[in-house]
Amino acid sequence: AGSGNNGGDEFAAARHLANLGMRLKIFFIGDVAHFSPATAANCETVKKMGIEIHELASDRTWDRLTVSLRFADVVVDGVLGTGFAGELRKPVLRLIELVNSMGKPVVSIDIPSGVAADTGAVSTVAMQAAVTLTFGLPKVGHFLCPGAALTGKLLVDDIGLPLQLLEEKSMRQVLLDDALATTLLPLRPLDVHKGSCGHVLVVA
């Protein structure tokens, strides 16, 4: 978990996972002073539930993380979110490289840590996710490499965005998926052949 809103989502996820009976540990990297009110509230709730939180601030804690990763079945990545841009700080870079080296399934919240949500760019390294759970709408960075190759299976959670916002003309991005492609392809008769479908000239 990081100290931004993505970390707040991580604390909230921990609460729900604990309620489902899962054993878990949270390793925190960042600065508590940067907590938003929502992140602070979720962190406090997790503490009251007795869930372990370890701050990655000493060699001993890093060693504990390494051991915990060896025995973990899955890693939930809530270090960096859609607001990330620029270069990774060295401790975060070290964390991402460590998690990737373990080969454990990673579930990233919103976008794999280290991927720029608007472009899919990666400055140095980024989390290799098996699954990415994003909210509201997919991000451009989920579909442009190298971000696309790091996203894994993409799940989009409906959080009730107003339909008016989704219909804004200022939203210029359109995702060509199977459903949209089906509407664009005309129905063809069973006896169709190459001479009855028109001609295409490609200039490249």
State where each predicted segment sits.
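YjeF_N-associated NAD(P)HX repair module
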Residues: 69-203
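A cross-family phosphate/adenosyl-ligand binding-site feature
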Residues: 1-74, 80, 87-90, 148
